[in-house]
Amino acid sequence: MPARTGFRLPRRGLLFLAVPDGAVSEMATRIAQMKPPPALGIVHLSGALGLDALSALEGNPRGSFHPLQSFPMPRDPSAFQGITVAVDATTPSLMRRLRALARAVGAKPRHVGDEQRVLYHAAAVYASNFVDVVVAEAVRLLRGTGWTEEEATRALLPLVEGAVANIRRRGPVEALTGPIRRGDAETVTRHLRALDRPDLYRMLALVALEIAEKAGLDPAAAGRTKRALTRDVAATRRRGRR
């Protein structure tokens, strides 16, 4: 239901609150003032909010139903095929209904309770929003060398898709490639010196180094790479004080 008044509440079934996160509690309060029938289950679609966002409706079964998928625009129902849907509910009956709904659209239900919600949603941001951020930064770098945005995006997307395919086949640790995985400190140093905004690279590289060590990177090579990353930080700070 949209964030508006003038609607009539159904006597039973499920009412989904398809509103921004910041409007969920307000909408719950407005619905509570309408005295909803006790048989009506009320469900929000937020990935970040727990069931406490619906606390104004404590007389009703309350739930959450969050598809772990990106919806920047209307998408075909096939977008639900094989994805995970995070579900939670205040009653076993509503939980069963939400699980059944997830399966009906081709998804896999997974219980995610209030205590897990914040980290669950942060993980979703990493796997979706931050991928876009990193690709946008890569496009920006290529544009700085004379590429158009279209050329850069077209060239980079197969690389992104290949990385995702490797993760699907081998998992995130074994799929890591590149200079960090090889412990190529010299290349890392050249990158840092060339970048106009090296902090993002440095932050991601340090996390990548942890993954590379799990994948079996030689400790000596890992040490050289870490020194290259941290030494550049110290040099940058010294230049800034001059």
Predicted regions, residues:
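Internal alpha-helical scaffold of NAD(P)-dependent oxidoreductase catalytic cores
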Residues: 1, 59, 76-169
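Rossmann-like NAD(P)(H) cofactor-binding subdomain of soluble oxidoreductases
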Residues: 2-76
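Short alpha-helical
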Residues: 22-23, 49, 92-93, 133, ...
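Short acidic/histidine-centered micro-motifs embedded in hydrophobic/aromatic stretches
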Residues: 155-159, 204-207, 224-228
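Interdomain hinge/lid region at the active-site interface
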Residues: 165-221
